[in-house]
A protein has these predicted regions:
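Acidic (Asp/Glu-rich) catalytic motifs at the cytosolic membrane interface
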Residues: 49-86, 174-187, 280, 284-285
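N-terminal, positively charged, Ser/Thr/Ala/Gly-biased leader segments
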Residues: 1-28
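Short, amphipathic, aromatic/basic-enriched membrane-interface segments that mark the entry/exit
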Residues: 10-18, 61, 77-87, 104-109, ...
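Multi-pass membrane catalytic core of lipid/isoprenoid biosynthesis enzymes
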Residues: 47-48, 65-120, 135-138, 142-146, ...
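Membrane-embedded alpha-helical segments that form the functional core of polytopic membrane enzymes
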Residues: 24-63, 95-103, 109-123, 161-173, ...
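C-terminal membrane-associated helical module and adjoining short loops/tails
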Residues: 2-12, 142, 148-287
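Divalent metal-coordination and catalytic microenvironments
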Residues: 15, 64, 256
Length: 287
């Protein structure tokens, strides 16, 4: 029983499941911006996206096995908790399951899913050797939003694309900060500019009677960002990992900012996903 529990935790750590609520949040936002639609179709698409995310995370560790052996020996593969061959199999298995779930969603969904998988594999393969790999990570989240929108009633619209680009900006800033997590070098301030992209888009697209709500939400999201950034930039006890974990959970707030229509149900759904992301981080590391 203990061995099974240990192996299950290993699988959860490999899949970085504490970030799965942010995948669900991306899916919910993309689907809402595309006009919503059939709930069953949305749930299947969200499950497929979860499979693609988890598969990508498994393969991330598989690609990094040699690096982790020297620099992160506590990770599941170098610590001996699981064999690298098993991680490769799990990773491609999750990717295959995710793609299989999307075969009935139409051409645009299949194209977005395939492009997402390509971006995932490219990121996993080069992120340790390519200085601009955060851009590739942003591309992954970009196509995730488009994939979710392709399951909606209106499909991929201009607003969906702009929202996906704004989320990509946030991911770029977050990812560049995350690169400082395992180093002693001070974190740079310039990624904060990218974190602000969703705030700027929200203020641009929400005019008239929607502006006040946008300002309030931007203020709340901005406060959370500053709280997280304090751990990396200004605190006397520097903790980049805590900053990055908080910003990862903050992806849900970015989605709320983009897609909330004022509905209590929609708002409470995003709030629940934000709470889940923070809760999951107590048990499984987010990075």
């Amino acid at each position: 029983m203990a061995a099974a529990t240990t192996y299950l935790r290993t699988l959860l750590v490999l899949g970085r499941v504490s970030n799965v609520p942010t995948v669900w949040s991306n899916c919910f936002a993309g689907w809402l911006l595309a006009g919503g639609g059939d709930g069953g179709r949305f749930l299947l698409m969200a499950f497929a996206a979860t499979c693609l995310y988890v598969g990508g995370m498994y393969l991330n560790d598989a690609f990094d096995a040699s690096f982790d052996l020297q620099h992160r020996p506590e990770r599941p593969i170098p610590s001996g908790a699981i064999r690298v061959e098993a991680v490769w199999a799990w990773g491609f298995g999750w990717l295959g399951l995710g793609l299989a779930c999307l075969f009935g969603f139409g051409q645009s969904a299949i194209i977005c899913a395939l492009l997402l998988v390509v971006a995932i594999l490219v990121y996993d393969a080069i992120h340790k050797i390519f200085a601009l790999s955060p851009l590739v990570m942003a591309v992954c989240r970009f196509f995730l939003i488009l994939l979710a929108a392709s399951a909606g009633r209106d499909g991929i619209t201009g607003l969906v694309i702009w929202t996906a680009l704004a989320l990509g900006g946030y991911i770029v800033g977050l990812s560049f900060l995350a690169r400082k997590e395992s180093t002693l070098a001070p974190a740079s301030h310039w990624p904060c500019l990218f974190l602000a992209v969703p705030l700027m888009l929200a203020l641009i697209v929400n005019q008239g009677g929607y502006l006040l709500r946008a300002v309030v939400l931007c203020t709340l999201v901005g406060i959370w960002m500053l709280r997280c950034l304090n751990f990396a930039l200004w605190s006397t006890q520097r903790n980049v990992g805590r900053c990055v974990s908080g910003l990862l959970a903050g992806i849900v707030l970015v989605d709320l900012l983009a897609a909330w229509d004022g509905s209590p149900l929609t708002g409470s759904t995003f709030a629940a996903l934000f709470g889940l992301a923070l809760l999951f981080q107590r048990f499984v590391p987010a990075t």
